[in-house]
Amino acid sequence: MADPVRLIVGLGNPGREYEDTRHNAGVWYVDALARRQGVFLTEDKKYFGLTATFSFEGETIRLLVPTTFMNRSGQATAALANFFKIPVTQILVAHDELDLPPGCARFKQGGGHGGHNGLRDIISRHGNSRDFYRLRLGIGHPGSADRVTPHVLSKPSKADRDLIDRAIDEAVHNTADMLRGDLNSAMNRLNGFKA
């Protein structure tokens, strides 16, 4: 068994102009998980984000959506994790993933930032530790590097958004395994899913 997850972070950019863009897929996941748990995210300036808590098998699980821009996501994550003494190995970060198509999602532990500025800042703010869990939510690749920024900062087509939402629903369904520290079960179940 791996470490159980105690903090779940959804990456994105703040503001209405970004809320429906691909780069906010991590926020969509945390929003869906909060709805499933019947909790509401509220602003907490101390942690530079929107937060909520719920109980799972007697443990407190914390949700966080940073209200900083993507490249400052580590500021919020570190503030909350440090205050509640949550080790980096008990953090799950949900983020958009160019290297997976819409409709795919994958849990993993560790790894680099892959050019993702939110992950880069989280790694930096946690003493260069890469040992947190990730939920990679596929948004597809636009085909060339010069089109990546416009791609992640634009809205997906209705068909792609439906696929992303179905993958998020499946990830939410399998989050309980992550909360128990059963990474292998969570990975096997989610890796077998394709919307």
Swiss-Prot record:
It catalyses: an N-acyl-L-alpha-aminoacyl-tRNA + H2O = an N-acyl-L-amino acid + a tRNA + H(+). The record marks 96 as: Stabilizes the basic form of H active site to accept a proton. The keyword Lipid metabolism does not apply. Its main location: cytoplasm. GO terms for biological process: protein quality control for misfolded or incompletely synthesized proteins; rescue of stalled ribosome. Belongs to the PTH family. GO terms for cellular component: cytoplasm. InterPro entries: Pept_tRNA_hydro, Pept_tRNA_hydro_CS, Pept_tRNA_hydro_sf. Its EC number is 3.1.1.29. The record marks 13 as: Discriminates between blocked and unblocked aminoacyl-tRNA. It is found in: Cytoplasm. The gene is pth. One of its GO terms (molecular function) is tRNA binding. The active site is at 23 (proton acceptor). Keywords: Cytoplasm, Hydrolase, RNA-binding, tRNA-binding. It holds the Pfam family Pept_tRNA_hydro. Monomer. The keyword Ion transport does not apply. NCBIfam families: pth. Hydrolyzes ribosome-free peptidyl-tRNAs (with 1 or more amino acids incorporated), which drop off the ribosome during protein synthesis, or as a result of ribosome stalling. Catalyzes the release of premature peptidyl moieties from peptidyl-tRNA molecules trapped in stalled 50S ribosomal subunits, and thus maintains levels of free tRNAs and 50S ribosomes. PANTHER family: PEPTIDYL-TRNA HYDROLASE (PTHR17224:SF1). This is Peptidyl-tRNA hydrolase. TRNA binds at residues 18, 69, 71, 117. CDD domains: PTH.
